């Protein structure tokens, strides 16, 4: 049976998943690997059906050698699920920024890789790593077609007045406009929640909260992106792990003029030293909760404040709200943050079931039975969505 391999390359981890071409549901991966690079000793875990390994330490810190070692576990060892490499017919890659060039999956060639590279200045934390992952797997699987699936593509349905900045129009003509990100995750959650909702006559209005180290909201009407908090780059919008989110642009001009900061220093500070880390001393929300000091509490309060006001803005874009969804590492696991956010949005008709909110991490509804607005927690499955997008494009 033909199979599709998916790579989701991140700054501190690589996720690999293998699916058959008969993808039925998000839990249908035949094989999964998760490589963690952000520790002193890089490690990975493997999953094959219900069988899951303990962390296995890599014998190298080289990304290239580490991925090669893990990929070979597809056909070697206790977690092997294929006998020969040629059982894999397609490979899908997540790419964060597709700009105005890519609105659907695309077969990767030299020209596409050049375009992805040229867009790296707009997503410096992501596109270079995505491109590195593509080139690594191309060397391992040189005769297999590789496809790119873009996080920006889901937001192509935003209207002109939403994606256009109030700056000189000539800038827009040169491609400076709002693109939005986390589209693969937002699209996945919208599809999953559709299964929970009874058909209704009026358009279904969902706000999806993807809260991880990067964070964004998406206003979704009947499965289509209407508005989102990220923009030209993944720096706009909510407060994030190490990124500032939206700030007064006058601050940047002031710092360049009066603080003797170079463009490179300013870029680094806003991308790597701001957000939760800049205020609370760490980008890890679990540590923010654990520190219990003035700065960590301020960071948490700021995060929730910007989250709730962002949800309010997305509600205005939709003209109402039928459902709210939390996903991503923070969204799925931080019950306190969900509770505080929903309490402060009670005026919208959000009524949280506190007991359901505390439960495990499976997909679930966590609102009261009679809550006017339904609230969900969904474990995002970007790799499945990438595989499905590739197969739909091919057929």
Swiss-Prot record:
Which Enzyme Commission number(s) are on file for it?
2.7.2.1
This protein is called what? Acetate kinase
The UniProt similarity line reads:
Belongs to the acetokinase family.
Positions annotated as active site in the UniProt record: 151
The pathway this protein participates in, as annotated, is: Metabolic intermediate biosynthesis; acetyl-CoA biosynthesis; acetyl-CoA from acetate: step 1/2
| Binding residues for Mg(2+) | 8, 382
**Transport: present as a keyword of the record?**
no
* Annotated site residues (Transition state stabilizer) in this chain: 182, 243
Which PROSITE patterns did the record assign? Answer: ACETATE_KINASE_1 (PS01075), ACETATE_KINASE_2 (PS01076)
What does this protein need as cofactor?
Answer: Mg(2+); Mn(2+)
Natural source organism: Protochlamydia amoebophila (strain UWE25)
General function of this protein: Catalyzes the formation of acetyl phosphate from acetate and ATP. Can also catalyze the reverse reaction.
- Please write the reaction equations for the catalytic activity of this protein: acetate + ATP = acetyl phosphate + ADP
Amino acids binding substrate: 94
Cellular compartments annotated? Cytoplasm
Instruction: Tell whether Cytoplasm is among the UniProt keywords.
Output: yes
The UniProt subunit note reads as follows: Homodimer.
- Give GO terms: molecular function aspect only: acetate kinase activity; ATP binding; magnesium ion binding
Q: Which domain of life is it from?
A: Bacteria
Cite the Gene3D superfamilies for this sequence. 3.30.420.40
The record's section on PANTHER family has:
ACETATE KINASE, ACETATE KINASE-RELATED
**Principal localization?**
cytoplasm
SUPFAM superfamilies found in the cross-reference section: Actin-like ATPase domain
What Pfam families does this protein map onto? Answer: Acetate_kinase
Annotated ATP binding sites: 15, 210-214, 284-286, 329-333
Keyword annotations for this protein?
ATP-binding, Cytoplasm, Kinase, Magnesium, Metal-binding, Nucleotide-binding, Transferase
List GO BP terms, alphabetically: acetate metabolic process; acetyl-CoA biosynthetic process
């Amino acid at each position: 049976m033909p199979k599709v391999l998916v790579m989701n390359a991140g700054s501190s981890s690589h996720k690999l998943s293998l699916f058959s071409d008969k993808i039925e549901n998000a839990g249908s991966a035949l094989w999964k690997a998760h490589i963690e690079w952000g520790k002193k000793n890089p490690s990975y875990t493997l999953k094959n059906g219900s069988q899951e390994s303990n962390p296995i330490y890599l014998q190298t810190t080289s990304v290239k050698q580490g991925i090669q070692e893990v990929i070979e576990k597809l056909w070697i060892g206790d977690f092997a699920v294929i006998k020969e490499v040629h059982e894999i017919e397609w490979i899908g890659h997540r790419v964060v920024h597709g700009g105005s060039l890519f609105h659907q999956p695309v077969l990767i060639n030299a020209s596409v890789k050049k375009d992805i590279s040229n867009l790296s200045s707009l997503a410096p934390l992501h596109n270079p790593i995505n491109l590195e992952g593509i080139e690594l797997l191309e060397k391992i699987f040189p005769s297999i077609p590789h496809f790119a699936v873009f996080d920006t593509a889901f937001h192509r349905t935003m209207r002109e007045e939403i994606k256009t900045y109030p700056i000189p129009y000539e800038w827009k003509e040169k491609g400076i406009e709002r693109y939005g990100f986390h589209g693969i995750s937002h699209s996945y959650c919208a599809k999953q929640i559709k299964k929970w909702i009874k058909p209704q006559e009026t358009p279904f209005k969902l706000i999806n909260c993807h809260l991880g180290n990067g964070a964004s909201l998406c206003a979704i009407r009947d499965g289509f992106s209407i508005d989102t908090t990220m923009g030209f780059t993944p720096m706009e919008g909510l407060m994030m792990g190490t990124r500032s989110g939206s700030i007064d642009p006058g601050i940047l001009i002031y710092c360049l003029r009066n603080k003797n900061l170079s463009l490179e220093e300013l870029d680094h500070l806003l991308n790597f030293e701001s957000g939760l880390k800049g205020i609370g001393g760490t980008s890890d929300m679990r540590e923010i909760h654990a520190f219990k000091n003035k700065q960590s509490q301020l960071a948490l309060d700021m995060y929730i404040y910007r989250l709730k006001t962002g949800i309010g803005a997305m509600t205005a874009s939709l003209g109402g709200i039928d459902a709210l969804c939390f996903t991503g590492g923070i969204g799925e696991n931080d019950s306190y943050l969900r509770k505080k956010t929903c309490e402060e949005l009670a005026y919208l008709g959000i009524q949280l079931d506190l007991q359901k909110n505390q439960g495990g991490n499976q997909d679930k509804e966590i609102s009261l039975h009679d809550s006017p607005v339904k609230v969900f927690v969904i474990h995002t499955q970007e790799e499945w969505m990438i595989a499905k997008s590739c197969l739909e494009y091919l057929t």
